[in-house]
């Protein structure tokens, strides 16, 4: 089978399955978040937590619940890592060091899953299952809850800023959406050979005749939610390149589908909840258009040959698993950087300068194609607010979005939400590259302007882009075990997650308190090809104005050498 045919079949299968589940899953999630009835298990949890499921929260109360729940998650996960050596199923592993425990706790609670450790030799099965896997569920549910709160802000009229009940949204998202889907995906992965074991491992004989110890872990259960919740942290160091995590081309396609499933279907949920499904299709069209362009650029870059080894092989095969090839590796890379997943089935650091630059740009666009679970939707809706404001300036009208006026407060909150990530990326990169100890952490270095120095700069830029966007993937040539990287990247993950959430919830509260303004002849239509073009242009323009200079110093300069 030719690479072109393989690529076409994989893309077609992913698109076909997403098209089949788009309507039923999107409408189901809308019913989950608008239903007035509770499941028996949910009612029991509400009584246990002393939560009134019928009580509404203002955006301040909702934000306080998000922050309080997440802070508790960081503390519990940190303590669990520190004391894992004295807990059951430790398999002889000691407690995790304070710096790594902090970085990991922040990473998993913020849905980033940045891993500055080797999972097999650092985390016990108990820590993996009771700590990291739990956060994979609830951190995804938090993102979905915030997206739904913003939708309610657009729908509700004069509700005093009430945007729902965080505890209800969190519980329903976990029990009714994430758990059932993860269970089904885990069964499919098990059928493909993904392992599920609490044994410490086994010893065999390698090709050279020497004993080789192979680690085992409860992989299938965590692999499912790792992809479904756009988390990305692997149970094994090689992540989805490891045959125990991703053994076959079919399991690879299943994981790609799991990554894209909820972010894509949430656009249908958005359209259903606001009562105008064309709005959801417009948002989906923008996401799909950006995704297709990045996929095309990356595929073209990786299908060529650059350097002696690539020329001999006929393509950029370094760092890629032969069972996936170029098509499966590129499709996975674009999916994982277009969302907040960060899982990898190939080495992004080994990609061509243009291919690596494309997946980096995918993150720098704000991860909105189609974005993380929940975060992708509220991210692109914030950009839609900016686009409507720009459109209003062009025609001299007061901007309105779905019947809500966009006043100074709303535009300010939207702008702040958009600016958080670029500020973290640029400030973090600038400080890091001037520190003397950074040179020792670089896998690629050299005199200024040389290929090694340029790629080393790209490694640093990629790290802070990944952390600030809560992605978690990395250019593996950068060693991030120092206290500076552990703390600075941890802070980027925290601020990159929760500052935009605060601004989005404040925007939701402000919109919910407004009356609805009837549409007039001067109202900018926000459904259809015209607005899709305006929104796409806004996304590209914001990213280009912000990041083109720094990209010119890294991937672009490297590609031109």
UniProtKB/Swiss-Prot annotation:
Record keywords, A-Z: Cell membrane, Ion transport, Membrane, Potassium, Potassium transport, Transmembrane, Transmembrane helix, Transport
Highest taxon listed in the record's lineage: Bacteria
Major subcellular site: membrane
GO MF terms held by the record: P-type potassium transmembrane transporter activity; potassium ion binding
Membrane topology qualifier: Multi-pass membrane protein
InterPro entries hit by this protein: KdpA (IPR004623)
Pfam families: KdpA (PF03814)
Spans traversing the lipid bilayer: 5-25, 60-80, 86-106, 131-151, 177-197, 247-267, 281-301, 376-396, 415-435, 489-509, 531-551
Keyword Metal-binding on entry: no
Keyword Transmembrane set for record: yes
Any one Gene Ontology cellular component term annotated for this protein: plasma membrane
Compartment(s) of residence: Cell membrane
The family this protein is said to belong to: Belongs to the KdpA family.
Role of this protein: Part of the high-affinity ATP-driven potassium transport (or Kdp) system, which catalyzes the hydrolysis of ATP coupled with the electrogenic transport of potassium into the cytoplasm. This subunit binds the extracellular potassium ions and delivers the ions to the membrane domain of KdpB through an intramembrane tunnel.
Oligomer and partners: The system is composed of three essential subunits: KdpA, KdpB and KdpC.
This protein's name: Potassium-transporting ATPase potassium-binding subunit
Organism in which the protein naturally occurs: Nocardia farcinica (strain IFM 10152)
Lineage start: Bacteria, Bacillati, Actinomycetota, Actinomycetes, Mycobacteriales
């Amino acid at each position: 089978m030719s690479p072109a045919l393989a690529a076409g079949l994989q893309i077609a299968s992913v698109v076909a399955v997403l098209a089949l589940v788009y309507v039923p899953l999107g409408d189901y999630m809308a019913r989950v978040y608008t239903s007035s009835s509770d499941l028996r298990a949910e009612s029991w949890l509400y009584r246990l937590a002393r939560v009134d499921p019928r009580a509404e929260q203002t955006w301040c109360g909702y934000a306080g619940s998000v922050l309080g729940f997440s802070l508790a998650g960081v503390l519990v996960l940190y303590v669990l890592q520190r004391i894992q050596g004295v807990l059951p199923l430790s398999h002889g592993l000691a407690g995790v060091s304070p710096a790594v425990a902090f970085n990991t706790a922040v990473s998993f609670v913020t849905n980033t899953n940045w891993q500055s450790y080797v999972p097999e030799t650092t985390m016990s099965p108990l820590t993996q299952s009771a700590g990291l896997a739990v956060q994979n569920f609830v951190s995804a549910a938090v993102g979905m809850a915030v997206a739904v709160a913003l939708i309610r802000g657009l729908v509700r009229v004069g509700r005093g800023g009430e945007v729902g009940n965080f505890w209800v949204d969190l519980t329903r998202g976990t029990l009714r959406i994430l758990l059932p889907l993860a269970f089904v995906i885990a069964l499919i992965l098990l059928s493909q050979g993904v392992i599920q074991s609490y044994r410490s491992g086994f010893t065999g004989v390698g090709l050279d005749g020497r004993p080789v110890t192979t680690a085992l872990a409860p992989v299938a259960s965590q692999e499912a939610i790792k992809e479904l919740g756009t988390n990305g942290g692997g149970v094994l160091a090689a992540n989805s390149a490891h045959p125990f995590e991703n053994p076959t081309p079919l399991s690879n396609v299943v994981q790609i589908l799991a990554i894209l499933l909820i972010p894509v279907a949430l656009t249908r949920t958005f359209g259903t909840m606001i009562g105008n499904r064309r709005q959801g299709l417009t948002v989906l069209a923008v996401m799909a258009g950006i995704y297709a362009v990045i996929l095309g650029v990356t595929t073209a870059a990786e299908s060529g040959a650059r350097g002696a080894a690539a020329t001999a092989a006929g393509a950029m095969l370094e760092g890629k698993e032969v069972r996936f090839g170029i098509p499966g590796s590129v499709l996975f890379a674009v999916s994982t950087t277009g969302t907040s997943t960060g899982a990898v089935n190939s080495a992004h650091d080994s990609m061509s300068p243009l291919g690596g630059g494309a997946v980096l740009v995918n993150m720098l666009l704000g991860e909105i194609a189609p974005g993380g679970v929940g975060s992708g939707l509220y991210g692109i809706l914030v950009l839609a607010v900016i686009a409507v404001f720009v459109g209003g300036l062009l025609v001299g009208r007061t901007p309105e979005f779905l019947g809500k006026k966009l006043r100074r407060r709303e535009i300010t909150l939207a702008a702040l939400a958009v600016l958080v990530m670029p500020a973290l990326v640029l400030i973090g990169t600038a400080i890091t590259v001037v520190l003397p100890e950074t040179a020792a952490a670089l896998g690629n270095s050299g005199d200024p302007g040389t290929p090694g120095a340029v790629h080393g700069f790209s490694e640093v830029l990629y790290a802070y882009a990944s952390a600030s966007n809560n992605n978690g993937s990395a250019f593996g040539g950068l060693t991030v075990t120092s206290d500076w990287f552990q703390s600075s990247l941890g802070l980027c993950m925290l601020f990159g997650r929760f500052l935009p959430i605060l601004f989005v919830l404040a925007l939701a509260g402000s919109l919910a308190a407004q009356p609805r303004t009837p549409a007039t002849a001067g109202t900018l239509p926000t459904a259809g090809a015209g607005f899709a073009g305006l929104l796409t242009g806004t996304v590209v323009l914001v990213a280009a104005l912000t990041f083109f200079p720094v990209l010119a110093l890294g991937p672009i300069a490297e590609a031109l050498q």
